[in-house]
Amino acid sequence: MKLTRILFIAAMFFVASAAAGWAQLHAASDGPVAYGHHHVNGTDLAAHKRFWANTLGGIPTAFGQSEMYKFPNVHVFVREREPTGGTKGSTVNHIGFRVPSVRATLGKVRAAGFPVVTRQELPPGVAVIDDMAYIDNQDTYIAFVMAPDNVKVELVEARDQEEAIALHHIHFDTNNVDAMKAWYVDTFGAIPGTRGSFQAADLPGVNLTYSGNPASLEGTEGRSLDHIGFEVENLEAFCRQLESAGVEFDVPYRELDQLGIAIAFFTDPFGTYIELTEGLDKY
């Protein structure tokens, strides 16, 4: 199983190297740990292509029966595998992208036939007009849409943004906000803070947002968002540091020499499956 995963990663990175440079992991040069990728399990690759490429504008790169979609500061990998559930109910409730106009992006989402779920995903006290909500404490408009296989996606308006779309945040659900936030701050060096009313922490390229949820939450592995990925400088030493802190790796550090890539996998204490990479920023 582990060998299959490694061969799969090798194949997808090889093909990805041909993609255009517009959607690279530019933030990877801004610190020793930056965000790298989302990895999705999907039942219909054509539907995922319509969402990630045709609708949101990611740059598609084919590798066998799978796809990768490149956005500024995040690559979205889609593997053909039936997920055990969507993002809701797992430790990663949704992923967020920033766009210059939420209204314009929603028009594309509707035209492509994907669900817009803003009203369903916000508390009754938050006003939703034309499927958009103005969030006063963030001074911006947001909306929620559903990608195939119930991957929940938030759109956050950034009016002055030059790119058509870029990574914005990962929104975690947890039974213990303080503990989860502290773990990501201590482990990855994220800068603690807030985002509006939410507890949060920042890494180059991404905001990590935390919400309390008293429900029983499942880990991400096997679900539609299988794992999240961080790009790490000097990954081998970083893995040794994590091991000394008690982290047990599902896939220990190893190098894929032919690609100049190194990888490792582990699960955080709250159930989120994480891949660490070094070299993904070159693709």
Segments and roles (model prediction):
Residues 27-29, 82-87, 159-161, 215-219:
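Short, flexible, solvent-exposed loop/turn segments with mixed acidic/basic and small polar residues
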Residues 45-47, 76, 83, 102-104, ...:
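Generic "edge-of-domain/loop-turn" microfeature
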